[in-house]
Amino acid sequence: NQKTVGIIDKNDEENYVKIAEPLGVVAGVTPVTNPTSTVVFKSLICAKTRNPIIFGFHPGAQKCCTFAAEILRDAAIKAGAPENCIQWIEYPSIEATSALMNHSGVDVVLATGGSGMVKSAYSTGKPALGVGPGNVPCYIEKTSNLERACNDLILSKTFDNGMICASEQSVVVDENIALKFENIMLKNGCVFLSEEESEKLTSYMINPEKGTLNGVVAGKSAVEIAESSGIDVPKNTKILIVRLKGVGKDYPLSVEKLSPVLSYYTVKDSLEGFERCKEILKFNGEGHTAVIHSQDERIIEKFGEMMDAGRIIVNSPSSQGAIGDIYNCATPSLTLGCGSKGKNSTTDNVSVNNLLNIKRVFKRRVNMQWFKVPSKIYFEKGSISYLEDMDDINRIFIVTDETMVKLGNVQKVIYHLNKRNNNCQIEVFSSVSPDPDVETVWSGLEIMKRFSPDAVISLGGGSAIDVAKAMWMFYEYPDL
């Protein structure tokens, strides 16, 4: 229900207006992994923001992407969208996609793909939203709910056969719970490979010259990968797990694997676990995502501070947690920014907010006027904003009547009080009648005593002011 057209925010209290406009023509670059879902997502956020999009599909996914784009285009036109709201290059190539991104009619590039293609997007001289690779570490700390952590890991890593860039690529486990972890994973259909089997798997999965994943692996099940590697595993195998002692080029399977294959490390404690996770992120995963399973809030907070990742997923499956709005409040997205660490422009879960030009209209605000009798009295429209800056007020007692509440005037006062830096406490007494009697004063005084304010605000006419003055007097001088 987010508004993305015209006036999207009008703040009468601070006198500004925000107006949303589209960025313009979007060049959409899509990968061979998650091709159709990326097409659907980018088309939807462009439609929501009134930006036409022209796709350059990966040549290996041209047919399925075209099929998806045709369905979306036809549905959009049927709903009233312009005829050419969704377009694509019919004969794909790297050269054609590059020409699209550099075309003078394109206003912004929205790129998902290999690091080379994303780098090209940022080299066009146009605003670009590109995303980087995700070599995601998952740290399972000794205080974690281990059964749940294993379930989350399997759920995430097997989803779409591990094709999600936010899926866990390596699992790092405290050694004093490692045996229990292994037993749970074995019980749930995972297989730990021997050193010989790991070498066979490496030969099949990794290009020895480039040190990168062979394209034929992506999207295959654990059983298919094992068979292609010459490894015998049970037919119900969900994940292949490889024990590694290090990270980097000397350990080929420590790369992003985009498959139901996990590298596995054990560590002595959280300090060593953090360092291992940082190593994994630095090996072509910086800025993307890191995962921790723990019940220790201090450990979780420290992990968040130390990891160079735009998303820290806590006690959740990473694939589903990173894309947002399932296990957390993250913005739903299939385009996950990696920030400056990943050579991207944002760490956002890219969505409609990234595809809008927001114009801000700032109206003149009248300077507050005052005179001292003996303290300051502000008047003119907007004068209550001074409540944001008054010194030494922490507990505010508001005396008013029901009419002021219904008119929204009390809420205006509270609005400015809530903008203070000290998180002040507020109590409202709204039982002042047009002709208040002494009982009104006594009843309000009892509430005031319990609340112990250091400031009183009277809001309304003479009745509210008189009651407030009397209450404050008896509060300050209870012996009268």
Over which residues does each language-model region extend?
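C-terminal segments
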Residues: 1, 191-235, 291-368
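ATP/NTP phosphate-donor binding region
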Residues: 368-455
